[in-house]
């Protein structure tokens, strides 16, 4: 039990920060306050990400439809999330720095399965699940080399851009955000903004910093579209009810 508590303390208070801040009350330490804030933010983002897409999943399930949600956008977002989680896991970064990517990937898998199933593509959903399982095994067993994961993470930046632009474009053409969940999109936007700070503080890895910065800007645009097309989405919903 004491080992578990020690691991938790070390996760939140790197180095000698526990002693500096909570024993010596050295709140003006040059690095510890920022380091602990970053770790705390990281854990908060990771915990929040467990439910990030639950509103979206429930909305699709209730409507029995994924209308307005770009399958290509979700697939590319999944590649980006898996790339970040796999690269960070194999690089040995603390879980609080990438755990959200893992949980986001799991939820994106569910959303993509919903898109396939509600469009009658059952066999496609089975094949998709098989591919995801094989990739997960390859990462954990180290069958996939680190060079490949680095390449995927590097490619993740344009992948994120294309993924978000596809959804932005679909919203623009429809003048509506369809079945997109406002709560999920807002949490994505806030989470990627916070991740820019935690990536700078915890890893200093430019691949992650640029990736999260790009995602934050594009998530902000999608969030703004809810307010731009609010009246269109409301009128479309009323027509469907009538």
UniProtKB/Swiss-Prot annotation:
Residue intervals of the PQ-loop domain: 37-95, 152-202
InterPro entries xrefs: MannP-dilichol_defect-1, PQ-loop_rpt
Subcellular location: Membrane
GO cellular component, one term: membrane
Record keywords, A-Z: Membrane, Repeat, Transmembrane, Transmembrane helix, Transport
GO biological process, one term: oligosaccharide biosynthetic process
Main location group: membrane
Highest taxon in the source lineage: Eukaryota
Transmembrane segments: 40-60, 68-88, 98-118, 120-140, 148-168, 180-200, 207-227
Membrane topology: Multi-pass membrane protein
PANTHER family for this protein: MANNOSE-P-DOLICHOL UTILIZATION DEFECT 1 LEC35 -RELATED, MANNOSE-P-DOLICHOL UTILIZATION DEFECT 1 PROTEIN
Protein family membership: Belongs to the MPDU1 (TC 2.A.43.3) family.
Name of this protein: Mannose-P-dolichol utilization defect 1 protein homolog
Organism: Caenorhabditis elegans
Upper classification of the organism: Eukaryota, Metazoa, Ecdysozoa, Nematoda, Chromadorea
Gene from which the chain derives: mpdu-1
